[in-house]
């Protein structure tokens, strides 16, 4: 099974010492994402702890 990588990451500053990473998709990538099996679909937004923020 090949890993499917689509889109690009945009970093968005958040409050409460967090940074938000948003996966930005082009229209073609959105179609590819929608056609992935459910267990292979990506999480589009992830909040992580960022010690320098």
From Swiss-Prot:
Additional record remark: On the 2D-gel the determined pI of this unknown protein is: 6.2, its MW is: 25 kDa.
Protein name as it appears in the record: Unknown protein from 2D-PAGE of needles
